[in-house]
């Protein structure tokens, strides 16, 4: 059946066989969707469980999660660089280089994870003070404890991300999904036991994360070294300057872009934190629910890297454009369904959390802003640039993201949140303005075709 589909569609590409069938795309996107759904669901469970420990605890965890997200994007950016390079080599049918680059990704991820973990463990308190200034003492203590414990998991998380990126590059996201299911079961069961049975606080949320990430890293690395996969990871890995440079050539601009993006988010949350615990808690709950609305877009964005990377490596710009449009359409349809559902059942969803009436009302308003705007703007703002990254057009995406964050999101957040006193609502309106700028720039870049000149075999 798959062969028949490929033959029928071949004339669309001048008689060339499509690099991906409909079934290939579904096999890639489906497990990624499940994996993203699990991640967000467990994040919601974490927030709900820790909310039972009081609003100081939920505020401390939410503030540190912004820092954790900043760290995680470093690992994700490196994994993205590796996935792009491996996908391009596979598309060009250069198996030897694809194998070598997979080993370099694992080595670089391990080094980065250990370095960042030690740094955050030692400097947890000054990091939180630097990011958020004067916050309540109980919120600070909860945040320091949570950051130090989660820092222990960074090396495991970095290596898991590397392994998952390699399997995505092979078009096999099912393996990372299976391991993710186990990881999230360990996490959520551990949280329940630690908080409800043992009576622990924020440490009861943090330690299960460490355990689950350690198990996931061991399992996925074990699968990477098994035979029978499209890639053969070298058993002995030494740093290869040329190959590492190629991976970092994609990873560093992506890391810089995403790190500054997360740093910008931390800055705007620091503005919100000056308005008190109600605004911090409402912002935390809204962020968790909005993460649910972005699940399909994030999954398709990851698939975009593999698909476009393979097309670019094969030197087929026509298929690159075709699959970019196809996946972007999938993102709009799926995000419409998810965000529509969130808006429809918004009050019951927010009601799950143990919030005061004032906090609940604000959280509902923030989700309405995000979900209503995300229907139209999020896919082109965050899924489309992954196609540009996979074509090595990373500097453009970096410049647009950084400038848009600095000028629109930070600038208007200060104006609306601080100067006009709108609080969290002002920050979220500024976020929508940032999205509009990103959409205009990324759509124009894709249509211009300038990305076609960035890849060199």
Residue ranges and their predicted role:
Residues 37-59, 128-137, 193-200, 259-292, ...:
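Helix-terminus/linker motif at the lipid-water interface of multi-pass membrane proteins
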Residues 58-118, 157-176, 269, 280-346, ...:
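Small-residue-rich hydrophobic transmembrane alpha-helices
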């Amino acid at each position: 059946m798959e062969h028949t589909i490929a033959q029928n569609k071949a004339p669309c590409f001048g008689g060339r066989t499509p690099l991906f069938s409909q079934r290939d795309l579904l096999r890639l996107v489906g497990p990624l969707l499940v994996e993203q759904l699990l991640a967000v669901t467990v994040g919601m469970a974490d927030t709900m469980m820790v909310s039972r420990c009081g609003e100081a605890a939920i505020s401390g965890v939410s503030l540190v999660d912004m820092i954790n997200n900043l760290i995680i994007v470093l690992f994700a950016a490196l994994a993205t660089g590796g996935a792009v390079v491996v996908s391009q080599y596979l598309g060009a049918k250069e198996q030897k280089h694809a194998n070598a680059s997979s080993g370099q990704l694992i080595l670089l991820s391990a080094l980065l994870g250990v370095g960042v973990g030690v740094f955050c463990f030692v400097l947890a308190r000054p990091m939180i003070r630097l990011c958020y200034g004067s916050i309540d003492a109980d919120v600070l203590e909860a945040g320091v404890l949570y950051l130090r414990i989660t820092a222990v998991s960074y090396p495991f998380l970095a290596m898991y991300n590397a392994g998952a990126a390699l399997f995505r590059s092979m078009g096999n996201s099912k393996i990372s999904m299976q391991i993710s299911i186990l990881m999230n079961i360990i996490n959520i069961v551990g949280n329940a036991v630690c908080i409800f049975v043992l009576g622990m606080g924020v440490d009861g949320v943090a330690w299960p994360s460490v355990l689950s990430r350690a198990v996931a890293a061991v399992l996925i690395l074990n699968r990477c070294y098994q035979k029978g996969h499209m890639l053969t990871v070298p058993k002995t890995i030494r740093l290869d300057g040329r190959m590492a440079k190629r991976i970092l050539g994609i990873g560093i601009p992506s890391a810089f872009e995403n790190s500054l993006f997360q740093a910008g988010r931390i800055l705007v949350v620091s503005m919100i934190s000056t308005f008190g615990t109600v605004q911090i808690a409402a912002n935390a709950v809204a962020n968790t629910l909005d993460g649910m609305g972005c699940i399909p877009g994030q999954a398709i964005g990851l698939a975009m890297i593999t698909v476009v990377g393979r097309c670019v490596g094969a030197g087929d710009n026509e298929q690159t454009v075709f699959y970019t449009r196809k996946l972007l359409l999938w993102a709009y349809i799926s995000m419409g369904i998810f965000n529509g559902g969130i808006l429809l059942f918004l009050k019951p969803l927010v009601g799950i959390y143990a919030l005061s009436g004032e906090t609940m009302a604000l959280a509902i308003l923030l989700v309405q802003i995000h979900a209503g705007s995300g229907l139209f703007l999020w896919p082109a703002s965050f899924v489309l640039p992954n196609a540009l990254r996979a074509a090595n057009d990373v500097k453009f995406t970096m410049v647009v993201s950084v400038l848009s964050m600095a000028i629109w999101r930070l600038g208007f957040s200060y104006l609306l949140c601080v100067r006009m006193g709108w609080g969290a609502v002002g920050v979220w309106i500024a976020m929508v303005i940032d999205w509009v700028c990103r959409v205009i720039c990324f759509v124009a870049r894709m249509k211009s075709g300038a990305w076609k000149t960035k890849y060199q075999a």
